[in-house]
Amino acid sequence: MSTSFDFFNDTKAKMPHLAFLRMKEAVLGKRYDLSVAIVGTSKMRELNRRWRDKDKPTDILSFPLSETEGEIYINPTEAKKEAKKFNRTYDNFILFLFIHGLVHLKGYEHGVIMESIEQRFRKKFGV
């Protein structure tokens, strides 16, 4: 069974591709097909409005397509704003968000259990 890790950057923001691949494999496994799209504010707002009925951009969205396939969308502009609120560097916060999205794809919802799982992976990757 072949799997894929597709990475599309539709912005000028720099992203840590290799770290994303390692994190994806640690959280979801090597057999999980993942597409990551780095998108601008208008595209993220459109996605958030369509799928969450929220008419504003957000920093990350994750969509499980099946048990072994999903998509993550990251908006670097919103991530940069949020990084300051969490007292993190931009690069660190992008990885923080990515772990968050991966854990959602694993099937977890916001709460104590999800936070515990995220913390374990953040520690593993120094995030």
Where are these regions (language model features)?
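An acidic/histidine-cluster motif and surrounding catalytic segment
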Residues: 1-94, 102-127
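Histidine-centered acyl-transfer/condensation active-site motif
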Residues: 98
